[in-house]
A protein has these predicted regions:
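A structural "flexibility-hinge" signal
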Residues: 1-213
Length: 213
């Protein structure tokens, strides 16, 4: 299975990057950088949330109904004239559910790493979240996923299927390192415990997430 980051290099991914960049008035290369960092974090957070029976059922319900992948069938229509406010509202709800109280920390980390302001990061994530759910719904349909165990395998495959040359693969291993606690706390603990690249994303995440809540 192709990973979520491999998607960004596909024709569909290029359409997503181009559309999100146009919607947020940001350069495509910077938008791609942000999405390359953000998508594994969001996907890992979804995987963590789906590790409980209630979380898995909630996610299954969402991708079997509203987020069935149909959003991917008309990306041109989605982005032409600006993304509909209903889609952005949906994105806000998805982010709130997936990241909870850590959303601002994630946005600040992505902002500091990419050099893009946090407001633009927030807009990118709001547009990307419903599309990511659509990708998940589409993959679930293709693989006939209809159980929590199947969902866990799907999410794990999308994370672990990423090409090894992607520098963001370290993020996925960090996020998967601990079975309990929040995704962001896992990141902080790992990078604070062995932060060899002070100037890199590890140092950034450690600084932003290392303090008390």
């Amino acid at each position: 299975m192709s990973g979520i980051l491999d998607l960004l290099n596909s024709d569909l991914g290029k359409s997503i990057v181009s559309g999100v960049a146009g919607q947020t008035n940001q350069p495509e290369n910077k938008t791609q950088d942000v999405l390359t960092m953000a998508l594994p974090v969001l996907m890992s957070a979804m995987k963590r949330n789906a590790s409980t029976p209630e979380g898995a059922q909630g996610l299954l319900g969402a991708i079997n109904s509203k987020h069935d992948g149909s959003i991917l069938d008309n990306l041109g229509g989605l982005f032409s004239g600006g993304v509909d406010s209903n889609v952005l509202d949906d994105g806000s709800k998805i982010l709130g559910h997936v990241l909870g109280g850590k959303q601002q920390n994630v946005e600040n980390a992505l902002s500091a790493k990419s050099g893009m302001d946090a407001g633009s990061i927030s807009q990118i994530l709001k547009v990307a979240a419903p599309i990511l759910m659509g990708v998940l719904g589409s993959q679930a349909k293709q693989q006939n996923v209809n159980s929590p165990s199947g969902l866990d395998g799907l999410l794990g495959g999308l994370l672990k299927g990423n090409s090894p040359q992607h520098e963001q693969s370290f993020l996925e291993s960090i996020l998967d390192a601990d079975g309990d606690g929040s995704v962001i706390d896992d990141v902080a603990g790992m990078v604070l415990g062995g932060n060899k690249k002070k100037g890199g994303l590890g140092g950034l995440l450690g600084g932003l997430f290392g303090g008390k809540n």
